[in-house]
Amino acid sequence: MQFQVLVIGGGPGGYVAAIRAAQLGLKVGLIEKENLGGVCLNWGCIPSKALLKAAEYYQQIKHSDEFGITCEKVSFDFNRIVQRSRDIASQMNNGIGFLMKKNNIQTFEGTARLISATEVSIQGKTETTTTKVTSDNIIVSTGARPTILPHLEVDYDRVPSALNSPIFSIPSEPKSNSLNSWIAFFRSKTKK
């Protein structure tokens, strides 16, 4: 298979580059080993903003008496909050898939390995299939992975780790009973 532009990585840098190249009339392929949208859309920026918004609403309701509004027994449903963040990520992931099809970008699911300046092998998820493709131009946009800084100790009983299991799909509420303190993991400080 021959492309004019082959993009390795389907995160914000990769899929935008692929779409733009296709809009310019080039034959484009894109290789992504996990989910279109990368870490940002699936496990970072987008789902964390959904969780932060839930924490913001929760805090506003808890302190609504300052505005003359009384709300008694304010509570939250942790599983629904997390599910909403997953649903938003899934919807956006599907939107990127639609844009790939709309712009005639051939997508490959698997791990890319550069063989030469113009040739790439793609190891499928099943690890039994390998596809070789060539391209006049190759864009490497492989993104990021979460990591724990060596000098930073993390209390895994209180803060779930994105390294062990994705934090946005943990099966139950963390031991901290406060949604806002749990969300604090994503920002340097919480609003009061």
Name each model feature, range by range:
Residues 2-3, 19-26, 31-171:
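Glycine-rich flavin
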Residues 7, 18-21, 175, 187:
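Hydrophobic alpha-helical segments that mediate membrane insertion or helix-helix packing
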Residues 169-172, 176-182, 187-188:
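Low-acidity, Ser/Thr- and Arg-rich intrinsically disordered low-complexity segments
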